């Protein structure tokens, strides 16, 4: 076990976050990562809210470890984003956004549910 600020924040035992690799970031993979001590991530981009909920519920049934939700924001309909993010934030301790700056209203939804908002960047430039 390696304790860091990251492990303290997300509740994992090793400071590793699974890369949310599109369709490969399934509930089974995320739960395996969480069982190994890392932060598992389920990619929920493009799914309706009930599928987001079902995928995260499935991952949580497979592991007691922390499992987050990932949104590739270029593929999320802005009109449905609040409902999707709320469904994820109710079930995941971390909600991760990628590619564009997350809308502050979405971050507020995440925080209101008691989850952490994370912004994945593609490069330092």
Regions found by a protein language model. Give the residues of each.
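Active-site entrance/lid segments in N-terminal catalytic domains of soluble metabolic enzymes
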Residues: 1-125
